Regions:
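A translation/RNA-centric and nucleic-acid-associated enzymatic feature enriched
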Residues: 2-161
């Protein structure tokens, strides 16, 4: 027993990305690993970070919220789980609108993402593969990832291992 309650009925703390930027006076409204460590110190082992401004993690197949953020900014439908002061789990809803995905592919990071791929693989090849991919029918879905070594570190910090 580590002095922790069982998970049933527990509400984990969480916060809106821009609210946390304001709280921790994050430069340029960008949270860093330093800010994640502050969340750990203040809120404990697990913290859900939500309502990311789209520009903080633009990705061409990430879905945008139909509702704008408090400052009128576009919001990505994603969340990060901060465990032990580290971003450990990331999840986001994926886009299912082919036209929007194509537009985002060409415009995210002011077109630099597409240009990087053109430089690495040849523009003709990249556009051919993009067209082939976008021919599929897309259903509402999500994707995510877990940093296993970070999760192990967080579990050790929490006394669970």
């Amino acid at each position: 027993d580590h002095g922790r309650a069982p998970l049933d009925g527990i509400d984990f703390p969480g916060g809106n990305y821009l609210s946390m930027c304001g709280k921790y006076t994050a430069s340029d409204n960008i949270l860093t690993d330093y800010h994640e460590s502050l969340m750990y110190k203040e809120y404990g082992d697990v913290f859900f970070l939500t309502h990311f401004p789209y520009n903080t993690s633009p990705f061409w197949n990430m879905k945008k919220s139909p509702i704008k953020g408090s400052t009128g900014d576009e919001v990505a439908l994603k969340c990060d789980v901060i465990m032990g002061g580290m971003e450990t789990i990331g999840s986001a809803e994926r886009a299912d609108d082919v036209d929007m995905m194509r537009e985002q592919f060409h415009t995210i990071s002011n077109g630099d993402y597409a240009q990087l791929l053109y430089n690495l693989f040849d523009k003709k090849r990249v556009l051919k593969e993009l067209d082939e991919f976008l021919q599929f029918d897309f259903i509402p879905r999500f994707g995510g990832g877990i940093g296993v070594t970070r999760m192990i570190s967080a579990m050790r910090l929490a006394g669970l291992m």
